[in-house]
Swiss-Prot record:
Assembly notes: Homodimer.
Descriptive protein name: FMN-dependent NADH:quinone oxidoreductase 3
Pfam family, any one: Flavodoxin_2
Organism from which the protein derives: Burkholderia lata (strain ATCC 17760 / DSM 23089 / LMG 22485 / NCIMB 9086 / R18194 / 383)
Domain of life: Bacteria
Length: 207
């Protein structure tokens, strides 16, 4: 069965721009893959433990030498990495906060970049284990970061995502940028009017 992993990381709940667009993507994906399955992971609805010294020690302990306590400490992280390996495709909603990802998304990434789970060491260097999968990123940003925008050079998020997921082996990446979203939250723009061209951009991916 073809499987899509939908990841949301905005703390804005139903008001989230990125979440509405990942949902639109999932609906269109199911139309294109009627026998497929969408697995939803909302990073803002779970309590992720911090990456502390004990977690790092557990992570770098060989699996056959970990204690029961260490395995329990890594259990949620292993659930995340299993979801990534089990999926054939990803759609990932990422709000831009202070020119980077949301805190929830960054913590999730720290949980999933793991030796033997999503990356392995080879004689020629690290090799990502998520190859052969497509990732579509939906970025929502308050300011405008398009090619001709004044702040275009401050879009650090897209190259960062390309670097990180490329390290994990993902080569097929697509981006939908819903920038200028501050106009919605300040009442300068109607939500439906703002979303319309971005919904069209998502649908165009399936044309």
């Amino acid at each position: 069965m073809f499987k899509l992993l939908q990841i949301d990381s905005s703390p804005m709940g139903d008001a989230s721009i990125s979440r509405r667009l990942t949902q639109e993507y999932a609906r269109n994906w199911l139309r294109a893959h009627p026998d497929g399955r969408v697995v939803e992971r909302d990073l803002c609805r779970i309590a992720m433990p911090p990456i502390d010294a004990a977690w790092i020690a557990a992570n770098f302990t060989p699996p056959d030498r970990r204690t029961a306590q260490q395995n329990e400490m890594l259990a949620l992280s292993t659930t995340f990495t299993t979801e990534l390996r089990d999926a054939d495709e990803y759609v990932i909603g990422v709000p831009m906060h202070n020119w980077g990802p949301s805190a929830h998304f960054k913590l999730w990434l720290d949980h999933i970049v793991r030796q033997g789970e999503t990356v392995e060491t080879t004689p020629s260097g690290p090799r990502g284990l998520l190859g052969g999968r497509r990732a579509t990123f939906v970025i929502a940003a308050g300011w405008r970061y398009g090619p001709d925008a004044e702040r275009a050079q401050r879009n650090f998020l897209e190259p960062w995502l390309r670097t990180l997921f490329g390290f994990l082996g993902v080569e097929d990446m697509r981006f939908v940028m819903a920038d200028g979203a501050a106009d919605v939250f300040t009442g300068k723009a109607d939500s439906a009017v703002f979303l319309a061209p971005h919904v069209d951009a998502v649908r165009a991916l399936f044309a």
